From Swiss-Prot:
The PPIase FKBP-type domain, residue ranges: 161-246
Disulfide bonds: none
Family of the protein in this entry: Belongs to the FKBP-type PPIase family. Tig subfamily.
GO CC field: cytoplasm
Organism: Azotobacter vinelandii (strain DJ / ATCC BAA-1303)
Name used for this protein in its record: Trigger factor
Name of the coding gene: tig
Length: 436
């Protein structure tokens, strides 16, 4: 077999491969002999059909099948011989495809980039330091109570925080507009659900009262037909209800799957969950900075085929997440291009880190992570057993741990500074990472 390789760009390779005619004929004859043993042709006993008849009927299909398989096999042999790592399926262009002659074709494809990780010392990481204080637990208890607020109907003027049952009709230039009317809508004053001035305009209203609100839609309103326009809303208040926060008792605790009657035990459980959330938030922010630093320090040219594959995966995920009747291929690729490039680039960099620093999953860390995941469930022992009994899930945990070990390896060499912050600041979502 003859092979020549040409680099047409940093990652694109062009292989010209020649397969001897003798090898082709051997494969064709092998298929014809297999066909002869099972062919059923009128006038001949099974297995006794003359080869000339078999060849006349089946040679063309046998040749096409043989050529297809030989192209696959010879391409694989060629990339192994040339020590190439294809990053996607090749584009095959036949040059000589005639009976009796050597098969010659050109395969064009991309290869994985070859690079070494550098610049770890230049990566700057700010590692947050925080604790869960008693005041943080107090705040969390209030948040949980507000999330489970009940409303009790009252006979008085409406105040901020009250829930109103209202009917309203909105008009622009004297005409009702789509989506501008509703009946029996529940609205909490001060929630910011409606455009500016709507909720404030109902403060002081009583059940049975009607008010007309003259308002203006924001210039950046999502409905461009209404953006910046003046509108009038005729509002009827059906009822006014005030918020009632639930008591911190056993009934309230049971809403969160905690079968405790004492406030101290509930606070301890909430505090434990907050500690877990804090650790995860700090770890996530450190990881994001490390990955951003690796990207900045190691610019890598990424095969287009890998990005296209990742775009397709993200399309499928989007359809599964948001549903609807849309097909993945109908979603514009541009929507996912930056995210796909970042994910693929980081995947290549992380894989190179694992290889370069000879990293392997630390089984003690795998066990710790599984136990931490399991601690969020009511039957943690069963969750741990499930992970260790499910090879696919266990493999995914090992991948997460390996990625954490990559982060730890970078932190050993990076410029790390610690910063003391409050619990709230530590768990506050970070800004979305920039694309590579």
């Amino acid at each position: 077999m003859q092979v020549s390789v040409e680099s047409t760009s940093a990652l694109e390779r062009r292989l010209t491969i020649g397969v001897p005619a003798e090898r082709i004929e051997t494969e064709v004859n092998k298929r014809l002999q297999q066909t002869a043993r099972r062919a059923k042709i009128p006038g001949f006993r099974p297995g006794k059909v003359p080869m000339s008849v078999i060849r006349q009927r089946y040679e063309e299909s046998a040749r096409q099948e043989a050529l297809g398989e030989l192209i696959q096999a010879s391409f694989y042999e060629a990339v192994v011989e040339q020590k190439l790592k294809p990053a996607g399926a090749p584009s095959v262009e036949p040059k000589v495809f005639e009976k009796g002659k050597d098969l010659e074709y050109v395969a064009t494809f991309e290869v994985y980039p070859e690079f070494e990780i550098t610049g770890l010392e230049s990566i700057a990481v700010e590692r947050l330091q925080a604790e869960v204080a008693e005041s943080d637990v107090d705040n969390m208890l209030e948040i949980l109570r507000k999330q489970n607020t009940h409303y009790k109907q009252v006979e008085r003027e409406a105040r901020d925080g009250d829930q109103l049952n209202i009917d309203f009709v909105g008009k622009v230039d004297g005409e009702a507009f789509a989506g501008g009317s509703a009946k029996g809508t529940l609205l909490v004053l001060g929630s910011g659900r409606m455009i500016e001035g709507f909720e404030a305009g109902l403060v002081g209203a009583k059940a049975g009262e009607e008010r007309v609100l003259s308002l203006t839609f924001p210039a950046d309103y999502q409905n461009l037909d209404l953006a910046g326009k003046a509108a009038e809303f005729a509002v009827t208040v059906n009822s006014v209800s005030e918020a009632e926060l639930p008591e911190l008792n056993a009934d309230f605790f049971s809403l969160f799957g905690i079968n405790e009657s004492s406030l101290e035990a509930f606070r301890a459980e909430v505090g434990k969950n907050m500690e877990r959330e804090l650790r995860q938030a700090i770890k996530s922010k450190v990881k994001t900075q490390v990955m951003d630093g690796l990207l900045a320090a190691n610019p890598v040219e990424v095969p287009k085929a890998l990005i296209e594959n990742e775009v397709n995966r993200l399309r499928v995920q989007a359809v599964q997440q948001f549903g609807g009747n849309i097909k993945p291929e109908q979603l514009p690729a541009d929507l996912f291009q930056d995210q796909a490039k970042r994910r693929v680039t980081l995947g290549l960099i992380v894989a190179e880190m694992v290889k370069q620093f000879d990293l392997k999953p630390d089984e003690s860390k795998v066990k710790t992570l599984i136990e931490e995941i399991a601690s969020a469930y009511q039957e943690p022992e069963q969750v741990v057993a499930w992970y260790y009994g499910n090879e696919q899930q266990l493999s995914e945990v090992r991948s997460v741990v390996l990625e954490e070990q990559v982060v730890d390896t970078v932190l050993q060499k990076a410029n790390v500074t610690d910063k003391a912050v409050s619990y709230e600041e530590a768990v506050k979502p970070a800004e979305a990472p920039q694309a590579a």
